[in-house]
Amino acid sequence: MALKTFNPTTPSQRQLVIVDRSSLYKGKPVKSLTEGLSSKGGRNNTGRITVRFQGGGHKRTYRLVDFKRRKFDVEATVERIEYDPNRTAYIALVKYADGDQAYILAPQRLAAGDKVIASEKAVDVKPGNTMPLQFIPVGSIIHNVEMKPGKGGQIARSAGGYAQLVGRDQGMAILRLNSGEQRLVHGTCLATIGAVSNPDHGNINDGKAGRSRWRGKKPHVRGVVMNPVDHPHGGGEGRTSGGRHPVTPWGKPTKGKRTRSNKSTDKMIMRSRHQRKK
């Protein structure tokens, strides 16, 4: 899908670049595949702000997307491609041969009328088909990759995202992720062929603050413009640099400080995303 620019009849339209969604379905989602979604405004069950700068935004309905794809060996037909306000990618409504319906992540080049299938055996290597990594040809572009068999896809799910299967080793598959990381995933984990739809999402320009507010994002206030009571970087006469290495409002290092501490899965990472690109 192409990008849309606008004749600047207002100041906000001068910079505005959005994705042309004219080819997407214009109706409402399937009611049996949706749930209500209440607005939290960044608050937890005690009413305290636990995530800053969230609140407002348009009301949403949550679409139940099937990330597990465990309805094996039943062919499904793509009914339509839909917009989903809860994610950056588009979703596809599929209807199985037995009459069941489901939403799946729409990969690039998937269109209404296409057939998709999920299997525990090898199937055709075409966008939307799901099978275990042990049967996918090396070099394939994949998305919605499981990290534990049966848990559902967790890797490469956002707009334009993908991973590449670069090898196999003793029952494990070696994946190269967009971040540059190379990691091992068990060969029985499922993955779907293709890259995720809406790759132009990274090129959009909101043009005005209000468009972020429609999404429920409030202005992100920098610590350096606060008072000392509000932030470690606050205070000072005139503009200051903060006077110390960047920290959170609670004094913990931020902006690049590594926080990963799951040593049990370190052995699954063959090449860190932090290693210098060669």
Swiss-Prot record:
InterPro entries linked to this entry: NA-bd_OB-fold, Rib_uL2_dom2, Ribosomal_uL2, Ribosomal_uL2_bac/org-type, Ribosomal_uL2_C, Ribosomal_uL2_CS, Ribosomal_uL2_dom3, Ribosomal_uL2_RNA-bd_dom
Gene3D superfamilies documented for this protein: 2.30.30.30, Nucleic acid-binding proteins (2.40.50.140), Ribosomal protein L2, domain 3 (4.10.950.10)
GO cellular component, one term: large ribosomal subunit
Keywords (A to Z) from UniProt: Ribonucleoprotein, Ribosomal protein, RNA-binding, rRNA-binding
PROSITE patterns reported in the protein's UniProt record: RIBOSOMAL_L2
Subunit architecture: Part of the 50S ribosomal subunit. Forms a bridge to the 30S subunit in the 70S ribosome.
Protein name as catalogued: Large ribosomal subunit protein uL2
Species assigned in the record: Rhizobium rhizogenes (strain K84 / ATCC BAA-868)
